[in-house]
A protein has these predicted regions:
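ABC nucleotide-binding domain "signature" region
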Residues: 23-35
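Conserved ABC ATPase signature
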Residues: 44-48, 52-54
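Catalytic Walker B motif of ABC-type/P-loop ATPase nucleotide-binding domains
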Residues: 69-72
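Helix N-cap at the start of a conserved alpha-helix in ABC-type nucleotide-binding domains
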Residues: 80-82
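Short coil-to-helix segment of the ABC ATPase nucleotide-binding domain corresponding to the Q-loop/switch region
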Residues: 6-13
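Conserved signature/switch motifs of ABC ATPase nucleotide-binding domains
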Residues: 43, 63-64
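Hydrophobic anchor residue at the start of the ABC signature
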Residues: 58
Length: 130
């Protein structure tokens, strides 16, 4: 959940601040540019659209370069172009940072971009486990 009392930049960098680690400014700039939020960094989050808030949340999730990212419908509020940019960013994080991304989606076209798909129906794994 984004904190409404903080602006976009502060929300994204919150995990870095809490961990008292150094900000990788190059990585930060790459994330915000890819997500199209570089012009919103000083904006209060309560003034953002749903899709913009979603992109800020994705940036915050990625800023610490996690080994594992759990993402529940990460592209749910995004238009097609932003969805593709987010998926490309996830793929880069996977390849360049070795981040494992476990994503839940109901969008067939998004799931087809994954390396592995596990289909769950009525709470049971239907296929995808080797």
């Amino acid at each position: 959940e984004l904190l409404p009392v903080l602006n976009v930049r502060e929300n994204i960098l919150l995990p870095i601040k809490l961990n008292k680690t150094k900000v990788d400014e190059v990585y930060f700039e790459e994330i915000v540019k890819t997500l199209g939020i570089e012009e919103k960094l000083t904006s209060p989050v309560h003034k953002l659209s749903g899709g913009q808030k979603q992109r800020v949340a994705i940036a915050r999730a990625l800023i610490t370069k996690p080994m594992i990212l759990l993402a529940d419908e990460p592209t749910g509020n995004l238009d097609r172009n932003n969805t593709l940019e987010v998926m490309e960013l996830f793929q880069r994080c996977n390849k360049e940072l070795d981040t494992t991304i476990c994503m839940i989606t109901h969008d067939q076209s998004i799931s087809e971009m994954a390396d592995k798909i596990i289909h769950i129906e009525d709470g049971r794994i239907e296929n995808g486990i080797d």
